[in-house]
């Protein structure tokens, strides 16, 4: 599937929580010169007495859709300078958001999501996780407590790698989302495979691996990005989240699968765990077409 690099989808549910993603998404759309698709899903409403009021359910549904469109139109002023398309489809939010993203071939889907604490209306494990697994777009999960700059760019991104080509592809894709001169921490968390144990227990091999990464990532330095490879010991998800917090990262960028090549998360469930636990925004890139 060919994605349109000039289309972004923002999912809203009418809550103040979901609206925390508006300003960042608008800034991203301006920076990327992208058309923005606002989606507010409504559920079909059924009459409690269809035998007496056969058309009442449809009337309620029509009113709900009209209300959803009015809601999206009321937000238009916050997207000055951005081309908008409004969508008020019926159905299950997780399925409909994914469907609209694929029909419109959006490069990016943006959603507000809690990290670490609280329970979002769109809980990872339901809507956000479903979207992560089923769209070919990149998915940006924003945290209300840790929004990027007003320009919608990021200044210190953490990119975990596992030695697979798919995880390294993230480095080629994350550039447009970064500020000029941004810092890129490339992290290899060991302790996952026999190869990782060998790497960890051989300081010379660690040094060699870091040097190899620096050589591979030299092109990023040429684009004004400050690249710092790191190798640390620990379980992947915990190490990633801890490193991001300790080093002030304002974005974690990952692929949705790594070594296995299956349509799952990198190294089993690492991306899912990071998306649940990280305090900063998480940007997930699929690396192969959906099966």
How would you name each of these model-derived features?
Residues 1-4, 17, 24, 46, ...:
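Structural beta-alpha unit
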């Amino acid at each position: 599937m060919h994605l349109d690099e000039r289309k972004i989808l923002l999912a809203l549910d009418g809550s103040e929580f979901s609206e925390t993603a508006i300003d960042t998404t608008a800034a991203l759309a301006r920076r990327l010169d992208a058309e923005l698709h606002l989606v507010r899903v409504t559920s079909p409403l059924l009459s409690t007495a269809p035998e007496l009021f056969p058309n009442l359910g449809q009337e309620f549904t029509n009113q709900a859709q009209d209300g959803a469109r009015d809601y999206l139109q009321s937000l238009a002023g916050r997207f000055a300078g951005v081309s908008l398309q409004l969508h008020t489809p019926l159905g299950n939010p997780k399925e409909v958001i994914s469907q609209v993203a694929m029909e419109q071939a959006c490069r990016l889907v943006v959603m507000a999501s809690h990290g670490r604490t609280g329970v979002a209306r769109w809980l990872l494990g339901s809507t956000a996780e479903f979207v992560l697994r089923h769209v070919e777009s990149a998915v940006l999960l924003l945290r209300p407590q840790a929004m990027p700059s007003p320009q919608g760019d990021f200044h210190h991104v953490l990119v975990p790698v596992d030695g697979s080509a798919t995880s390294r592809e993230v480095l080629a894709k994350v550039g447009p989302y970064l500020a000029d001169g941004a810092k890129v921490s490339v992290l290899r968390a060991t302790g996952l495979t026999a190869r990782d144990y060998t790497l960890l227990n051989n300081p010379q091999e660690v040094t060699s691996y870091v040097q190899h990464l620096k050589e591979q990532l030299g092109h990023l330095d040429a684009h004004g990005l400050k690249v710092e490879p790191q190798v640390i010991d620990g379980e992947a998800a915990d190490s990633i989240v801890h490193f991001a917090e300790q080093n002030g990262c304002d974005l974690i960028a990952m692929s949705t699968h790594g070594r296995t090549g299956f349509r799952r998360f990198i190294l089993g469930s690492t991306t899912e765990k990071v998306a649940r636990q990280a305090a900063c925004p998480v940007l997930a890139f699929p690396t192969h077409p959906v099966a």
